[in-house]
Amino acid sequence: MKTILSNQTVDIPENVDITLKGRTVIVKGPRGTLRRDFNHINVELSLLGKKKKRLRVDKWWGNRKELATIRTICSHVQNMIKGVTLGFRYKMRSVYAHFPINVVIQENGSLVEIRNFLGEKYIRRVRMRPGVACSVSQAQKDELILEGNDIELVSNSAALIQQATTVKNKDIRKFLDGIYVSEKGTVQQADE
């Protein structure tokens, strides 16, 4: 069954400015600018109201799969708005049973060097995605903090660090060493 018209709106806060170029959404906020291209999805994007403070996503004659993309786009835009206002912060913790994992940040937080993982001499180097800064926590031992505006780049950088410390040729139920995401949040606290 095809639905004639289905739509959803996203409310835009006061301090955020959104511009549309075709199906490319550009979000400007206090922390910076994010852009995302939705050209591969056949939907209509439009700004509503005198102050352009709502973004509407329309889909005409969509089946079930196509209608699901409406909410997906709205979620992506909401994440972009959250990113340019609050920013995203992921915290990662080093876990080790015997050999302490030594993490060094190089090149102003864009390169992570992992040494002494399971006592190995090999140095693992993980480059952060552009726009993601990594730092070692001062308050907590063995903790890394990743910060950025784009949730996909921040979470992808965290995944690259976690995958760099995979244990090979051992029983992973016993060898739990690695660097894992411990907390996901925002850089600034939301005013409730």
UniProtKB/Swiss-Prot annotation:
<dbReference type="GO" id="GO:0002181">
    <property type="term" value="P:cytoplasmic translation"/>
</dbReference>
<dbReference type="InterPro" id="IPR000702">
    <property type="entry name" value="Ribosomal_uL6-like"/>
</dbReference>
<dbReference type="InterPro" id="IPR002359">
    <property type="entry name" value="Ribosomal_uL6_CS2"/>
</dbReference>
<dbReference type="GO" id="GO:0022625">
    <property type="term" value="C:cytosolic large ribosomal subunit"/>
</dbReference>
<keyword id="KW-0007">Acetylation</keyword>
<keyword id="KW-0689">Ribosomal protein</keyword>
<keyword id="KW-0687">Ribonucleoprotein</keyword>
<dbReference type="InterPro" id="IPR020040">
    <property type="entry name" value="Ribosomal_uL6_a/b-dom"/>
</dbReference>
<comment type="subunit">
    <text>Component of the large ribosomal subunit.</text>
</comment>
<keyword id="KW-0963">Cytoplasm</keyword>
<dbReference type="Pfam" id="PF00347">
    <property type="entry name" value="Ribosomal_L6"/>
</dbReference>
<protein>
    <recommendedName>
        <fullName>Large ribosomal subunit protein uL6</fullName>
    </recommendedName>
</protein>
<dbReference type="GO" id="GO:0019843">
    <property type="term" value="F:rRNA binding"/>
</dbReference>
<dbReference type="InterPro" id="IPR036789">
    <property type="entry name" value="Ribosomal_uL6-like_a/b-dom_sf"/>
</dbReference>
<feature type="modified residue" description="N6-acetyllysine">
    <location>
        <position position="121"/>
    </location>
</feature>
<dbReference type="GO" id="GO:0003735">
    <property type="term" value="F:structural constituent of ribosome"/>
</dbReference>
<comment type="similarity">
    <text>Belongs to the universal ribosomal protein uL6 family.</text>
</comment>
<comment type="function">
    <text>Component of the large ribosomal subunit. The ribosome is a large ribonucleoprotein complex responsible for the synthesis of proteins in the cell.</text>
</comment>
